[in-house]
């Protein structure tokens, strides 16, 4: 039986954006991919969700003040 990182209560939700979602995000933010914070392709959670270099990962964290916070990372 393999342990899934995303099943742990302290690990925020990670998901790979589709190509269309990624393009829309970059358009809304008015930036290029290279301007996003990075996450390595060999990061355990990136491996688990099947993220490949060049993908954009959406991270949704629970926040006591905001309720929910969304962050984006470029897989390198």
UniProtKB/Swiss-Prot annotation:
Reactions catalysed, semicolon-separated, are: RNA(n) + a ribonucleoside 5'-triphosphate = RNA(n+1) + diphosphate
Pfam families named in the record:
RNA_pol_Rpb5_C (PF01191)
Keyword terms, alphabetized: Cytoplasm, DNA-directed RNA polymerase, Nucleotidyltransferase, Transcription, Transferase
Per its UniProt entry, which superkingdom is the organism in?
Archaea
InterPro entries xref list? Arch_Rpo5/euc_Rpb5 (IPR014381), RNA_pol_subH/Rpb5_C (IPR000783), RNA_pol_subH/Rpb5_CS (IPR020608), RPB5-like_sf (IPR035913)
One Gene Ontology molecular-function label:
DNA-directed RNA polymerase activity
The broad enzyme category this protein falls into is transferase
Compartments, record wording: Cytoplasm
Major subcellular location class:
cytoplasm
One GO BP: transcription by RNA polymerase II
* Record flagged with keyword Transcription: yes
Q: Which GO terms describe its cellular component?
A: cytoplasm; DNA-directed RNA polymerase complex
Question: What SUPFAM superfamilies does this protein map onto?
Answer: RPB5-like RNA polymerase subunit
Enzyme Commission number(s) of this protein: 2.7.7.6
Q: What does this protein do?
A: DNA-dependent RNA polymerase (RNAP) catalyzes the transcription of DNA into RNA using the four ribonucleoside triphosphates as substrates.
Q: How does it assemble?
A: Part of the RNA polymerase complex.
**Family annotation (PANTHER family):** DNA-DIRECTED RNA POLYMERASES I, II, AND III SUBUNIT RPABC1 (PTHR10535:SF0)
Family assignment from sequence similarity: Belongs to the archaeal Rpo5/eukaryotic RPB5 RNA polymerase subunit family.
Matches recorded under HAMAP family: RNApol_Rpo5_RPB5 (MF_00025)
Protein name per Swiss-Prot or TrEMBL: DNA-directed RNA polymerase subunit Rpo5
- Gene encoding this polypeptide? rpo5
């Amino acid at each position: 039986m393999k342990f899934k990182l995303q099943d742990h209560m302290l690990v925020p939700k990670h998901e790979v954006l589709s190509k269309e979602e990624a393009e829309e995000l970059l358009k809304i933010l008015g930036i290029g991919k290279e301007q996003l914070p990075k996450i390595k392709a060999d990061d355990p959670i990136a491996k688990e969700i099947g993220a490949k270099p060049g993908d954009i990962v959406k991270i949704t964290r629970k926040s006591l003040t905001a309720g929910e916070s969304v962050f984006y990372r470029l897989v390198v």
